[in-house]
Curated annotation (Swiss-Prot):
Keywords, sorted A to Z: Ribonucleoprotein, Ribosomal protein, RNA-binding, rRNA-binding
Cysteine disulfide links: none
Role of this protein: Protein S19 forms a complex with S13 that binds strongly to the 16S ribosomal RNA.
Family matches, as PROSITE patterns: RIBOSOMAL_S19
Any one GO cellular component localisation term in the record: small ribosomal subunit
Highest taxon above the source species: Bacteria
Entries under HAMAP family matching the protein: Ribosomal_uS19 (MF_00531)
Pfam families: Ribosomal_S19 (PF00203)
Similarity section: Belongs to the universal ribosomal protein uS19 family.
GO molecular function, one term: rRNA binding
Official protein name in the record: Small ribosomal subunit protein uS19
NCBIfam families from the UniProt entry: rpsS_bact
Record-linked InterPro entries: Ribosomal_uS19 (IPR002222), Ribosomal_uS19_bac-type (IPR005732), Ribosomal_uS19_CS (IPR020934), Ribosomal_uS19_SF (IPR023575)
Amino acid sequence: MARSVKKGPFIDDHLMKKITKLNSENQKKPFKTWSRRSTIFPDMVGHTVMVHNGKQFTPVYINENMIGHKLGEFSPTRTFRAHVAGDKKAAKK
């Protein structure tokens, strides 16, 4: 279910403080965050955010196409193991 328009997009306060501080100092150094639920704002474009996926921090470079999405969408939490090509059991009919 989508978030109500009257509430506006969500971003954690500590994350917004980090972004405004880096923008005021004109720095683009990467920083860590556990806030996967925060929405990407236009102020964040050009920054590299290290998003926690439950095990490690994944670097996410933010560009214009990511605005409006959540940070967690770009840091996968599950590892995909490719399907085995020679699996005889699955090939039976």
